[in-house]
Amino acid sequence: MATLTIDEIVDAISGMTVLEVAELVKKLEEKFGVSAAAMVAASPAAGGAAASPAAEEKTEFDVILQDAGANKLNVIKVVRELTGLGLKEAKDLVDGAPKPIKQGVSKEEAENIKKKLEEAGAKVEVK
């Protein structure tokens, strides 16, 4: 079996779509019997009081599709436009709501994305 370096693995992951990375995380969780959510939840406890000021100065936001609403086709079109995903990937993302559409974006970009998705009939949350 070929041995991959950490840099090769990072390069491979950086070329993946959001859906592919989410699938990778899910498979790693299953294989190793762990949960990525548990790790994230444990991190703020270690930070204690230092985590509070950081929350006030948040500069990166995640746009979460909560529900596609009644006009799912228009929502899929907007998701494709915003993410560059193919039709099947965009449909899977919309069908799997709640799911992140974009992560680590500026507040202005997050609000623009939210506006476009809500105009298409979706329910969206910015975190």
UniProtKB/Swiss-Prot annotation:
Keywords: Ribonucleoprotein, Ribosomal protein. It holds the Pfam family Ribosomal_L12_N. Forms part of the ribosomal stalk which helps the ribosome interact with GTP-bound translation factors. Is thus essential for accurate translation. GO terms for molecular function: mRNA binding; structural constituent of ribosome. HAMAP family: Ribosomal_bL12 (MF_00368). It comes from Hydrogenobaculum sp. (strain Y04AAS1). This is Large ribosomal subunit protein bL12. InterPro entries: Ribosomal_bL12, Ribosomal_bL12_C, Ribosomal_bL12_C/ClpS-like, Ribosomal_bL12_oligo, Ribosomal_bL12_oligo_N_sf. Homodimer. Part of the ribosomal stalk of the 50S ribosomal subunit. Forms a multimeric L10(L12)X complex, where L10 forms an elongated spine to which 2 to 4 L12 dimers bind in a sequential fashion. Binds GTP-bound translation factors. The lineage of its organism: Bacteria, Pseudomonadati, Aquificota, Aquificia, Aquificales. The keyword Ribonucleoprotein applies. GO terms for cellular component: cytosolic large ribosomal subunit.
